UniProtKB/Swiss-Prot annotation:
The species this protein was found in: Salmo salar (Atlantic salmon)
UniProt lineage: Eukaryota, Metazoa, Chordata, Craniata, Vertebrata
MF terms (GO), sorted A to Z: adenylosuccinate synthase activity; GTP binding; magnesium ion binding
Gene3D superfamilies: Adenylosuccinate Synthetase, subunit A, domain 1, Adenylosuccinate Synthetase, subunit A, domain 2, Adenylosuccinate Synthetase, subunit A, domain 3
Protein localization: Cytoplasm
Catalyzed reactions: IMP + L-aspartate + GTP = N(6)-(1,2-dicarboxyethyl)-AMP + GDP + phosphate + 2 H(+)
Top-rank EC class of the record's enzyme: ligase
EC number of this enzyme: 6.3.4.4
InterPro entries in UniProt: Adenylosuccin_syn_GTP-bd, Adenylosuccin_syn_Lys_AS, Adenylosuccinate_synth_dom1, Adenylosuccinate_synth_dom2, Adenylosuccinate_synth_dom3, Adenylosuccinate_synthetase, AdSS_1_vert, P-loop_NTPase
Protein name: Adenylosuccinate synthetase isozyme 1 C
General function of this protein: Component of the purine nucleotide cycle (PNC), which interconverts IMP and AMP to regulate the nucleotide levels in various tissues, and which contributes to glycolysis and ammoniagenesis. Catalyzes the first committed step in the biosynthesis of AMP from IMP.
Gene Ontology biological process terms, A to Z: 'de novo' AMP biosynthetic process; IMP metabolic process
Segments for region (Disordered): 1-31
Residue sites binding Mg(2+) per the record: 45, 72
């Protein structure tokens, strides 16, 4: 690779010319390939995998930037359902290279088990198309045990739980932030040194959790085997992404996990995940500059769902909520827990847009609303009868908000066969246009079913 400019091209300013720019060679304004980012705009489970699957058919590179196997995507291709937790769902496309970035935390047994399960369904050649950053942190089995212990302790001391997936994600990110975590490069380096660090890490956790037992020798033996299986896939992630950005033209896609309202900084804290699920996480989790971010697509259901506990202003604890749960098959891919359901909340979507700067929205599962007589949309929050102009950081306050709704007549007809905008009932079109105008972001896709063919492209 050749560069068009370097520090040697600077001229000395010992005797500056009258025109400071005279004779100076400036760096070329060439930012390289742009990256398209797909992000959840609610509490997860919005259908990001479907949008990624749609875009991945034309993508050269599909990347994960944060989270771990706590995420869950279901993708339907030619009638087959593929479940992804850690692998980028773009791995289905035989022409795509998939990247697991440094911001992802990797449970190696889970990674290989997931790949093998999808192999049985028809996934081929994944190991030759997967790149893993050497800077990614490792999730160990004891991290998962600690995750469960912490949840039990929260229940005992506070009477409430976070609703963690118990996949060890939080403890692993805690190890990372405490600078005691272990990375892929450690595993593939001097194994004797890795073993010492691993034992020290186990001892630190055992000093905090007396009930934690770990068979270190057995674990190390397995980790060494997993490391050798992983070795051919590992690259310097920063250099790999730089080459991809500044080499020949490429379509690069970043597949966000979780969602805006689960972001460690901007979500409904503390009922959040442990990583940045917003657009900044794409930069820090892959080592790419903000200048290379191109399109940012937000994904939202035509209603709202949430797994686990935490404030949910538009939740419907009634027959409507049950109908949405049943018709939408709202069960978590990772946890198997039923999702809580409610009306679409535009306060949340506007908030997610403030943080992410969406260039377009995918509105999924419109067909689930087909049977409703009337449909409501949350427009604003009120406290003591007064509108508040922001999304509250204080969860106690969020629990107390009163939602101001706009009510629409239902279209009472089947939209699942629609493949073009004009195939949708007028009342459904009105609903979509209303949502679009009040978020201030164009809706690019409307989903009316499980498969990629059920995504109506608007422009």
């Amino acid at each position: 690779m050749s560069f068009s400019w370097s520090a040697k091209d600077h001229k000395s300013y010992t005797n500056p010319p009258s025109n400071p720019t005279q004779g100076l060679k400036r760096p070329r304004n060439d930012t390289g390939n742009k990256v398209t980012v797909v992000l959840g705009a609610q509490w997860g489970d919005e259908g990001k995998g479907k949008v990624v699957d749609l875009l991945a058919t034309e993508s050269d590179l599909v990347c994960r930037c944060q989270g771990g196997n706590n995420a869950g995507h279901t993708v339907v291709v030619e009638g087959k359902e593929y479940d992804f937790h850690l692998l980028p769902s773009g791995i289905i496309n035989p022409k795509s290279i998939c990247v697991i970035g440094n911001g992802v935390v990797i449970h190696l047994p889970g990674l290989f088990e997931e790949a093998e399960n999808n192999e049985k369904k028809g996934l081929k050649g994944w190991e030759k198309r997967l790149i893993v950053s050497d800077r990614a942190h490792l999730v160990f089995d004891f991290h998962q045990v600690v995750d469960g212990i912490q949840e039990t302790q929260r229940q005992a001391t506070e009477g409430k739980i976070i609703g963690t997936t118990k996949k060890g994600i939080g403890p692993t990110y805690a190890s990372k932030a405490s600078r005691i975590g272990l990375r892929v490069c450690d595993l593939l380096g001097d194994f004797k040194e890795f073993s010492t660090k691993f034992k020290n890490l186990v001892e630190q956790y055992q000093s905090m959790y007396s009930s934690l037992t770990v068979d270190t020798e057995s674990q190390l033996k397995k980790l060494k085997e997993y490391g050798e299986r992983l070795r051919p896939m590992v690259r310097d992630g920063v250099y790999y992404m730089y080459e991809a950005l500044h080499g020949p033209p490429k379509k690069i896609l970043v597949e966000g996990a979780n969602a805006a309202l689960l972001d460690i900084d901007f979500g409904t804290y503390p009922f959040v995940t442990s990583s940045n699920c917003t657009v900044g996480g794409a930069c820090t989790g892959l080592g790419i500059p903000p200048l290379n971010i191109g399109e940012v697509y937000g994904v939202s259901k035509a209603y709202t769902t949430r797994v686990g506990i935490g404030a949910f202003p538009t939740e419907q604890l009634n027959a409507t909520g049950e109908l949405l749960q049943t018709r939408g098959h709202e069960v978590g891919v990772t946890t198997g827990r039923k999702r809580r359901c409610g009306w679409l909340d535009l306060v949340i979507l506007r908030y997610a847009h403030m943080i992410n700067g969406f260039t377009a929205i995918a509105l999924t599962k419109l067909d689930i609303l087909d049977v409703l007589d009337e449909i409501k949309v949350g427009m604003a929050y009120k406290i003591n009868g007064k509108r508040i102009p922001h999304f509250p950081a204080d969860m106690e306050l969020l629990h107390k908000v009163e939602v101001e709704y706009e009510t629409f007549p239902g279209w009472k007809s089947d939209t699942s066969a629609a493949r073009k905008w004009n195939n949708l009932p007028q009342k459904a079109q009105n609903y979509i246009r209303f949502v679009e105008s009040h978020i201030g972001v164009p809706i690019k896709w409307v989903g009316v079913g499980k498969s990629r063919e059920c995504m109506i492209q608007m422009f």
